[in-house]
Amino acid sequence: MSSFTKDEFDCHILDEGFTAKDILDQKINEVSSSDDKDAFYVADLGDILKKHLRWLKALPRVTPFYAVKCNDSRAIVSTLAAIGTGFDCASKTEIQLVQGLGVPAERVIYANPCKQVSQIKYAASNGVQMMTFDSEIELMKVARAHPKAKLVLRIATDDSKAVCRLSVKFGATLKTSRLLLERAKELNIDVIGVSFHVGSGCTDPETFVQAVSDARCVFDMATEVGFSMHLLDIGGGFPGSEDTKLKFEEITSVINPALDKYFPSDSGVRIIAEPGRYYVASAFTLAVNIIAKKTVWKEQPGSDDEDESNEQTFMYYVNDGVYGSFNCILYDHAHVKALLQKRPKPDEKYYSSSIWGPTCDGLDRIVERCNLPEMHVGDWMLFENMGAYTVAAASTFNGFQRPNIYYVMSRPMWQLMKQIQSHGFPPEVEEQDDGTLPMSCAQESGMDRHPAACASARINV
């Protein structure tokens, strides 16, 4: 199991009575007296560990292979490596990242059905054998570049109920699957299993049932062709926050019976999945600062207000946008909600408002319309559930830098991490509720002790 130490990244252990929100407020207070009120994240690594415990309870037969593309921050990958997850990598760079943290090759699946030949060769030279394919061309590339590969056939699914659809780009049909299996046999390439992905943000858990059923058909085809498959990869699409229509346990309550029906526990089939946002979405909170403000009246050009009155509306410009962390709005169909760092007065008036990013592109709009009390330059806004498909795809367009990330973890979670490293997961460990986890802010296990003010540490990613 990979190590989890201070040397890898800076993480502060929270003292009893402190929460990640306290660290966020503290950091805001620290920078508020300076001119450099840059956007930043606070990320709770303990939240990721709690998600893992929840996974073990809800999907006991399924081994998670974290989708690195979702958030490739070193601290995230290191945390997941330390608790024993596998990793879904899509490129040479992602493979280098996880193997650089000591993750063995057998805990990596190269889950990209369309790979560059040089990167297939890199995987071969570094012991990564499991990889996906969905076409004859890919089979031929692998046969030449990595003949000892253990291939996983990616099949298409009905992802019409997903927010982000993937089967339009990846996946073989059932008819094509037989042809590909026959061709793999001719090329003497080993096909060990089937993978699918129902799409990100799936709103119908029954989609998983059909996909598992289709996978069973392909397993049976493989037996007829002469393969002995033993791996099923059920992909991703699991929610990572509680603000979704479909909850995680609602999905798993449908998946588990389907797995038991088509791939019973005595079938000898290993089952894995590729969760990404599930692990990281809720761990990250982003703080942005208002850098400019504009008052707009209904009759003024550029106002979208349909209100008959001449009441003013406000445009707020903040120091992160769709070319940075909020790229999730464009590419991940995210709907974000601004929270106020300062609690408004009970009788405070609210105005129709819009929120814009810092770049010179008119497309850089974060929130088209929301109701906010009047705010001012220098005030802060918070955005929760910002861990998935945000930092990984952020650019520096117009010269705006990516936000720094400040990592924290509660003392109980830290102690559990050390126990896992030393002795593995304790028997019958159960997910602990947030309310039973006192958050602490001091260092232990050789880490420097900080004063009760609970200063946070910075890591650049």
From Swiss-Prot:
Gene Ontology terms, MF aspect: ornithine decarboxylase activity; protein homodimerization activity
PTM annotation (S-nitrosocysteine): residues: C360
GO BP annotation list: cell population proliferation; kidney development; positive regulation of cell population proliferation; putrescine biosynthetic process from arginine, via ornithine; regulation of protein catabolic process; response to virus
Effect seen on changing G387 to C/D/E/F/H/I/K/L/M/N/P/Q/R/S/T/V/W/Y: Loss of activity
EC number: 4.1.1.17
Keyword Cell wall biogenesis/degradation attached: no
Active site as annotated: C360 (proton donor)
Superkingdom of the organism of origin: Eukaryota
Binding site for pyridoxal 5'-phosphate: S200, G237, E274, P275, G276, R277, Y389
Binding site for substrate: Y331, D332, D361
Tissues where this protein is expressed: Expressed during testis development in the outer part of the seminiferous tubules.
Coiled-coil annotated residue ranges, if any: none
Stacks against the aromatic ring of pyridoxal phosphate and stabilizes reaction intermediates, annotated site positions: H197
Job of this protein: Catalyzes the first and rate-limiting step of polyamine biosynthesis that converts ornithine into putrescine, which is the precursor for the polyamines, spermidine and spermine. Polyamines are essential for cell proliferation and are implicated in cellular processes, ranging from DNA replication to apoptosis.
Protein name: Ornithine decarboxylase
Gene source species: Mus musculus (Mouse)
Lineage: Eukaryota, Metazoa, Chordata, Craniata, Vertebrata
